[in-house]
Each structure stands twice: as C-alpha cells, then as structure tokens.
C-alpha cells in the first residue's frame, strides 16, 4: 500500500468520500510499512488493503460489515469474508455463511470462497479494521482503521440511494447509531464465526431479508448465487 493519491488507488467516488480521512489513510500506510520493516508483516497484501473501495461508490446497495481480515496467510484478499478461488478448505466463518445461504435461499454450496460476484453487484464487503498481523486476530484494532471505515459508512448513508446493511458481530454493531440516524434499514446478528454462529447467526436469513428490504426501497434484489 503505497503513498499514492486516493484517486489513483480507488474508485473516484470513494476517493471523494474518503477525502476527510485521507491523512489517516496515509498514516495507516506508514504504520504498515513500519510493520514490514520490523519483520511483522501484515495481511492482506498491500494492493488488496483498500480493495473494497475499488468498486463504484454510487453502486453500493448492500453493506456487509465484518470485523477484521482472516489472520491466515493466503486467505484475506481485501473483501470481508472472501478468499481467493484456490483457497481450500475455506475458513469456517465462510463455511457458516454458505450454510446459512443454502438454508435461507436453497442455493447450492458454492464451489469456492470467492465473493467477488457479490461485490460486482454492489455488495460492499467491508471489515471494520482493514489489516491484521499474520496469525494474530484483532491485532490492528485501535490502530486507526476504524475512523476510515466509519467515514466510508457515513458517506454511504448520506447518499440519496437505496441501501441495506447487514451487521455481523459486535464490531459491526457499533455502527447502528449511524444507520439509525440516516434511517438505513439493517439486519443484525451474531458473527458467523464458529465461536458465535449458533448464538443467532444461523437462522437469521440475512440474504432473503436484505432482498425484501431492497424491494421495499424500490431497488433491484441481489442474486446471491455463487458459482
């Protein structure tokens, strides 16, 4: 993640939306370079840290908020919960998401864990914290990403466009006041992690409920099927 202008590393709409935190993003770049220099490294790879902001800002219609990237090298790829097509087995959180997808909509289990088709349809797959130290979950909480992702969501809810939010876990739930103030409908449940999925994630029907809410807003539903 180099020190380039935002307009060179993300969608122009997102560059404008995140301009108020441009200095924070640059500071996070400095932090990540220092992590590399100290031999600690970080995930995902630098070119993928801001990947969620490469799809058009104006097209976002569903926001899915997670916590932080998978801490396993080779797993995180810049979209929350998603992994590269060649990752096998997929992370257990993602397996739980696919189980709920099947139960909710009856879609067959996807052949891989790549959620790019959702992103291509305007589903913003955003972690509250955008990086992590390898093997150390939650290690970059409180380092500065929270201000960036909060600004991203503030900008989203300020648009005059249909939006539905899906909040998975306690970190994501901290965004409820922002959504409530802007009258953005949201679906809240436990995180799909094996540690918490049985406490309210399973049976929450987030995919069908999101489409029902989009329909109420006059927006096209998402085709949640994956190859």
From Swiss-Prot:
Active site: 68 (proton acceptor)
Alphabetical list of InterPro entries matching this protein: UDG_fam1, Ura-DNA_Glyclase_AS, Uracil-DNA_glycosylase-like, Uracil-DNA_glycosylase-like_sf
GO biological process entries: base-excision repair, AP site formation via deaminated base removal
Function (record text): Excises uracil residues from the DNA which can arise as a result of misincorporation of dUMP residues by DNA polymerase or due to deamination of cytosine.
NCBIfam families per the UniProt record, alphabetical: PRK05254.1-1, PRK05254.1-5, ung
Coiled coil: none
Protein name: Uracil-DNA glycosylase
Main location: cytoplasm
UniProt subcellular location: Cytoplasm
Top-level EC class: hydrolase
MF (Gene Ontology): uracil DNA N-glycosylase activity
Catalytic activity: Hydrolyzes single-stranded DNA or mismatched double-stranded DNA and polynucleotides, releasing free uracil
GO cellular component: cytoplasm
Claim: Hydrolase is one of the keywords in the record: yes
Keyword entries, A-Z: Cytoplasm, DNA damage, DNA repair, Hydrolase
The organism's place on the tree of life at top rank: Bacteria
């Amino acid at each position: 993640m180099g020190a380039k202008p935002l307009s060179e590393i993300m969608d122009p709409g997102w560059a404008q939306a995140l301009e108020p935190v441009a200095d924070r993003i640059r500071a996070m770049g400095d932090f990540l370079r220092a992590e590399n220099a100290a031999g600690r490294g970080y995930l995902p790879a630098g070119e993928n840290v801001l990947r969620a902001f490469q799809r058009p800002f104006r097209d976002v219609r569903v926001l899915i908020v997670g916590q932080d990237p998978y801490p396993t090298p080779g797993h995180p790829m810049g979209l929350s919960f998603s992994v590269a097509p060649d990752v096998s087995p997929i992370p257990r959180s993602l397996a739980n998401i696919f189980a709920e997808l099947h139960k909710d909509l009856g879609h067959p289990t996807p052949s891989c864990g790549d959620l790019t088709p959702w992103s291509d349809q305007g589903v913003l797959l955003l972690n509250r914290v955008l990086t992590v130290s390898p093997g150390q979950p939650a290690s970059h909480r409180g380092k500065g990403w929270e201000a960036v992702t909060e600004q991203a969501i503030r900008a989203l809810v300020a648009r005059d466009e249909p939006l539905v939010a899906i909040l998975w876990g306690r970190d994501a739930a901290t965004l409820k006041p922002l959504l409530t103030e802007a009258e953005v409908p949201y679906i809240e449940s436990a995180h799909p992690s094996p540690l918490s999925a049985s406490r309210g994630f399973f049976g929450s029907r987030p995919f069908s409920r999101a489409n029902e809410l989009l329909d109420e807003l006059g927006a096209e539903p998402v085709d949640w099927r994956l190859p």
